[in-house]
Design a protein with these regions (language model features):
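Cytosol/matrix-facing amphipathic helices and coiled-coil assembly/linker segments
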Residues: 199-212
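Short intracellular "coupling" helices and adjacent cytoplasmic loop segments at the cytosolic face
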Residues: 188-202
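Alpha-helical transmembrane bundle of multi-pass membrane proteins
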Residues: 1-187, 194, 210-527
């Protein structure tokens, strides 16, 4: 917008002599939001574990609103930067806590679809912003950019209104030892009476799982890298997915693809942005529909392969064709750019948020997710800051053009191998059963065949020890110990549970004998 350039342009001018935003100013204006989001993501963990998911979300929205007001009122670049930094802190908190809240309150059969809706909401917001920009583009005063900046407050206020009606997540309440409140929260979310057997069983499993987790180690930041079971592996998986989401080049593509439409006869940058965002929204919907049926691993690998093919083809065509085939080359770039956006929006866009909100145990879920989300925003900052230099021409700029897609394509190929080796299939099992899967399944590529065979409540009821050893005289006990059959399993914030081993009938049915025994005595709890 010319009004924005005139307000915040300083010394740089375009070929016609009009003020424009210098490359270095453009880089910092765009990238400082990502710096704020990285900070906000890291702050979300201690605040979310202290105040709760819901209250911290409200706080994050408030910080975002303050940043938006700064941007609307900005008369100079410094105030605009301060506003974007504050808004980024708010967005960072929201980006951690919304998927976290969704995963902790959703039943397992719709958890993936519900968290995918987070990404759908982002794409709808991008589309709405494109429409607003088209409407205000022809205004001849600062309202041309102040109105779009002010309208950021609308979704923030809608989110605030919704949060005032929603309960705190039952898992956070269990973490704080407020089990009665957790039952009431779960009752509201499931629309079941608090005495309903299914609700009672679910709450008991959450409580038992959390107490078991605490016997394996504290809920510290160190624990997310070295704790049991395999927390280092899980943290590496989450951070790797979040960084690879950025290294697929999607933000670079969303920025650079507008230039491809020049060769397709589309001149307005606002119309280009609208077309791209329509593709983005429509493409997100298939991911919501198939994530529970196809699973997380398959979607991620299909998406990475599809993006790799598109990007390598774009780079190859641009390198191989000369000026005499420029029109054909531009058409190919537009086509494969759109297909690439489809593959990302239906797979890596939503599914990464689903996986990273599921794979961590309750005791460190907020901390681990904040670290993985911060890694996403750090890469986002680096790419946003460097993009103008990679795209620009002249001294100090790389002028890569579409050849940069060779790099993004290579990262997409790396992403396929990363998913195959590191990402466990978490669909159709509860968050508590994911802990069991990481204990029993050594390799991610075997995780799809995993079937839960026991519950943490069962372990407490039958007197299992904190090291996951069955009690003496239990039919699954394979070693003789001199310890008592009475086993206490608890945590410092709540009363301990003492389970007494009763006399059991030695005769078991064939179906019971065929169950995989929950023996975890020889499990390697290291990374």
């Amino acid at each position: 917008m010319n009004e924005f350039k005139e307000q915040f342009g300083t010394t740089c001018r375009d070929s016609s002599g009009d003020l424009e935003i210098c490359t270095k100013d453009s880089s910092i204006i765009v990238a400082i939001l990502s710096a704020g989001t990285a900070l906000g993501a890291l702050l979300a963990a201690p605040t979310g574990d202290s105040l709760g998911r819901r209250k911290t979300l409200l706080l994050s929205v408030g910080i975002f609103c303050l940043g938006s007001i700064f941007q609307v009122c900005a008369q100079a670049t410094d105030m605009l930067l301060a506003g974007r930094l504050l808004a980024g802190v708010g967005v960072g908190g929201v980006s951690v806590l919304v998927p976290l809240y969704q995963s902790e309150m959703a039943p397992k059969w719709i958890r993936g679809t519900l968290v995918c809706a987070y990404q759908l909401s982002i794409t709808v917001g991008l589309l709405a912003s494109s429409i607003v920009n088209i409407i205000t583009a022809n205004l001849k005063n600062t309202s041309a950019y102040r109105i779009p900046l002010a309208l950021q407050l609308v979704p923030a206020l809608i989110l605030t209104a919704g949060l005032l009606l929603l309960p705190e997540t039952p898992r956070f309440l269990v973490k704080k030892g407020r089990n009665e409140e957790a039952g009431l929260s779960l009752s509201r979310l499931r629309r079941l009476d608090i005495t309903h057997p299914a609700l009672v069983d679910e709450l008991q499993e959450i409580v038992a799982n959390h107490r078991y987790e605490l016997t394996l180690g504290p809920d510290s930041y160190k624990e997310i890298f070295v704790g049991s079971p395999h927390l280092g592996r899980r943290t590496f998986t989450g951070c790797g997915l979040q960084m690879l989401q950025q290294l697929t080049g999607i933000n670079f593509i969303m920025y650079y693809s507008t230039t491809f439409f020049d060769g397709a006869g589309v001149d307005s940058p606002y119309t280009k942005s609208l077309i791209i965002n329509v593709i983005n929204v429509v493409s997100t919907i298939p991911g919501l529909l198939v994530i529970e049926h196809w699973g997380r691993r398959r979607l991620l690998m299909i998406g990475a392969l599809g993006m790799a093919a598109c990007q390598l083809l774009m780079a190859s065509f641009n390198t191989a064709t000369g000026d005499d085939m420029k029109k054909i080359s531009q058409t190919i770039l537009v086509t494969f750019c759109s297909i690439n956006i489809f593959f990302f929006a239906s797979t890596w866009g939503p599914v990464v948020w689903v996986v990273t909100s599921e794979i961590y145990p309750l005791k460190v879920r907020a901390k681990a997710m904040s670290v993985s989300t911060a890694s996403n925003w750090v890469l986002n900052f680096a790419i946003a800051y460097s993009s103008p230099f990679m795209l620009g021409e002249g001294p100090g700029n790389a002028a890569f053009g579409p050849k940069i897609f060779f790099i993004w394509g290579a990262f997409c190929i790396l992403a396929v191998f990363f998913v195959w080796c590191m990402v466990y299939e978490t669909s159709k099992i509860s968050l508590e059963q994911i802990d069991e899967m990481y204990e029993r399944v050594n390799h991610a590529w075997n995780s799809k065949a995993f079937q839960p065979s026991w519950s943490f409540q069962q372990m407490l009821d039958e007197g299992w020890s904190p090291s996951a050893q069955p009690p003496i005289n239990h039919e699954l006990q394979t070693t003789t110990t001199a310890s008592s059959a009475d086993t206490t399993l608890g945590d410092g914030d709540s009363s301990s549970i003492t389970a007494h081993n009763s006399n059991r009938n030695n005769s078991t049915s064939p179906s019971e004998q065929n169950k995989a025994p929950p023996v975890m005595a020889n499990v390697d709890f290291s990374y």
